[in-house]
């Protein structure tokens, strides 16, 4: 008899057993009255284990059916040629399938109080975590570290990917091949919904913990104990609790000092008080200062300082940091305290190393009588110990720029600049050298006759040019020179011409008047420049000579105060006198504020 292939395939399909979670749940519900410890997941896992052996046994029992199925699906010609044999094989296959159904029912018939032991619970391929019906997070739970193969709970989201032959019932290392995965075990993504029942062992749940979570309701967390003391913790514990209030800081510890407490007490140990006599500080010192020096004072009482050096016997500070005191060159240092007095201006300052002698090749000279008068006056002042401050010696200076420059002396007051209200010369023009050269302010304000002088030099742009009022002008005999300077003019370029003119008239014994608006700045710089060129002096020496004067030959002009710009011009003029390659102006541009001249 010939049987079509389609009918054969229908026969096999109708008799092939189907396995699903619904059938598994029905089997589990029928057996739940007899066995309280079994559940749907255990039945499923036990079925997977028995199914493996069942497939192997069915393969041994009916190899003909498998080969027949393969032959019938791959070769249609053989199926039509052996129609009689197909009927016999179909009957044999139906018997084999009936056998499989009977073995399946027997395998799921679990006796009461009996737990399947074919596979350890730690090697389940799929496991339903406890109490996760409302679990929506994908965070993996805590892994179990127990080594018990029969009763140790296994953390959810652990799947065994090891080969089947290594899944031994009594494996000592359960977590060797486990991988911690993040699974979303929501009800909509799983085929089973029955939760695992609570363990019926003697250990009771430790308690319910309620934590604030971002959700609207507080979810109780059940901690289920087991035989080994390991717990399941609900995954809601992993959620960040909402902060309802700012935690308050504990009260600060009291810092009040008191007697030291006993060793066994829990209070903070406090150091004993140190008396003021040991600390050597006044009662008005702050507490912070007392605490900062307490340890230093304790070390100081036990350390003997080294012996003080001879020069620091009277010092109150550290003997190692006291420099030796300099002795005066006059030998007046007797260990007495040195009284420091402010530097007095005008007549109390001494001016040394000034000479009226000029080099032999110099084009300028003075009369021998004048030099003798300077020397005699100097000797008279030294013998009488007078208060005159100008001392002239016969030492010729090698350079006019060998003094230290102090900028504070030359800072001019603002009221002395461009001010006509100041009268620096109430008694008329000042004699600045041998009654031949005179310094004065604006002659138009002083009501003096300029025709009494042979040379009149006006260096102020504010003063009127009185050349028309100057009578009988003769070159090199009677002249009026007008140079309109301001307080910021570059006067160094004109000083050579002016000083040469002054020296020419001075050598011939003619009277010279030098003036500006006030007679204390621009005209004073002309006189200082003449001193520098005539006597080969530096800026400081020439300035001090004009300011302090000499009782007989030079009147003291203590009101002079040229500004800094004019002082720099005088320094520039001094560099040109000495033929210096680097000018003072260039030096000041690249030098610190304090310089040595």
Swiss-Prot record:
Pfam families: DSPc. It is an enzyme of class 3 (hydrolase). The active site is at 516 (phosphocysteine intermediate). The keyword Cell membrane does not apply. Keywords: Hydrolase, Protein phosphatase. Its EC number is 3.1.3.48. GO terms for molecular function: MAP kinase tyrosine phosphatase activity; MAP kinase tyrosine/serine/threonine phosphatase activity; protein tyrosine/threonine phosphatase activity. This is Probable tyrosine-protein phosphatase. It comes from Candida albicans (strain WO-1) (Yeast).
């Amino acid at each position: 008899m010939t049987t079509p292939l389609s009918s054969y395939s229908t026969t096999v399909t109708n008799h092939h057993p189907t396995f699903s979670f619904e059938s598994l749940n029905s089997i589990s519900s029928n057996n739940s009255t007899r066995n309280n410890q079994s559940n749907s997941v255990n039945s499923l896992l036990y079925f997977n284990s028995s199914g493996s052996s069942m497939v192997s046994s069915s393969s041994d029992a009916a190899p003909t059916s498998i080969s027949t199925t393969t032959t019938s699906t791959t070769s249609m010609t053989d199926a039509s040629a052996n129609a009689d044999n197909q009927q016999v094989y179909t009957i044999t296959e139906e018997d084999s399938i009936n056998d499989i159904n009977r073995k399946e029912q027997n395998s799921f018939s679990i006796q009461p109080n009996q737990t399947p032991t074919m596979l350890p619970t730690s090697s389940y391929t799929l496991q339903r975590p406890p109490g996760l019906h409302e679990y929506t997070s994908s965070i993996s739970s805590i892994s179990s570290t127990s080594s018990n193969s029969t009763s140790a709970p296994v953390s959810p989201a652990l799947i065994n990917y090891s080969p089947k032959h290594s899944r031994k019932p009594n494996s000592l290392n359960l977590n060797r091949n486990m991988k911690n995965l993040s699974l979303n075990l929501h009800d909509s993504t799983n085929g089973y919904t029955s939760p695992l029942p609570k363990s019926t062992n003697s250990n009771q749940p430790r308690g319910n913990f309620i934590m604030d979570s971002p959700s609207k309701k507080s979810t109780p967390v059940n901690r289920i104990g087991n035989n080994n003391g390991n717990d399941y913790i609900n995954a809601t514990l992993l959620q960040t609790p909402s902060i309802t209030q700012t935690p308050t800081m504990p009260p600060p510890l009291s810092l009040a000092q008191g007697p030291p407490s006993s060793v066994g007490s829990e209070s903070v140990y406090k150091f004993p008080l140190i008396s003021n006599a040991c600390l050597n500080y006044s009662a008005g010192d702050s507490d912070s200062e007392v605490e900062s020096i307490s340890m230093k004072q304790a070390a100081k009482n036990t350390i003997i300082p080294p012996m003080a050096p001879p020069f620091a016997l009277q010092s109150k500070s550290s003997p190692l940091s006291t420099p030796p005191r300099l002795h005066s060159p006059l030998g007046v240092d007797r260990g007495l305290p040195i009284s420091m007095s402010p530097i007095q201006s005008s007549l109390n300052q001494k001016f040394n190393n000034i000479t009226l002698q000029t080099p032999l090749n110099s084009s300028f000279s003075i009369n021998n009588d004048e030099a003798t008068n300077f020397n005699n006056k100097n000797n008279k002042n030294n013998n009488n110990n007078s208060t005159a401050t100008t001392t002239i010696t016969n030492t010729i200076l090698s350079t006019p720029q060998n003094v230290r420059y102090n900028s504070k002396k030359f800072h001019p007051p603002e009221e002395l600049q461009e001010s006509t209200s100041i009268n620096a010369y109430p008694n008329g023009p000042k004699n600045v050298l041998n009654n031949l050269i005179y310094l004065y302010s604006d002659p138009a304000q002083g009501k003096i006759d300029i025709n009494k002088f042979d040379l009149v030099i006006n260096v102020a742009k504010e003063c009127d040019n009185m050349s028309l009022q100057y009578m009988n002008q003769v070159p090199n005999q009677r002249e009026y020179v007008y140079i309109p300077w301001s307080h910021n003019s570059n006067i160094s370029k004109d000083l050579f011409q002016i000083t040469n003119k002054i020296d020419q008239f001075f050598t011939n014994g003619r009277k010279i008047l030098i003036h500006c608006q006030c007679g204390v700045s621009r005209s004073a710089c002309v006189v200082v420049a003449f001193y520098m060129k005539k006597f080969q002096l530096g800026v400081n020496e020439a300035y001090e000579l004009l300011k302090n004067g000499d009782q007989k030959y030079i009147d003291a002009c203590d009101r002079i105060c040229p500004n800094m710009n004019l002082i720099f011009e005088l320094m520039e003029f001094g560099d040109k006198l000495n033929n210096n390659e680097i000018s003072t102006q260039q030096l000041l541009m690249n030098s610190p504020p304090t310089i040595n001249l």
